[in-house]
Amino acid sequence: VVDIVDTFRNNIQGATK
């Protein structure tokens, strides 16, 4: 399970969006 990585990437994408 990669919840941290998923959330991290999602956070970056959302912030960069």
Swiss-Prot record:
Keywords, alphabetical: Calcium, Cytoplasm
GO cellular component: cytoplasm
Cellular compartments annotated: Cytoplasm
Signal sequence segment: none
Source organism superkingdom: Eukaryota
Species lineage: Eukaryota, Viridiplantae, Streptophyta, Embryophyta, Tracheophyta
Purpose: Involved in calcium binding and microtubule stabilization.
Protein name: Translationally-controlled tumor protein homolog 2
Organism per entry: Pseudotsuga menziesii
Location, primary (coarse class): cytoplasm
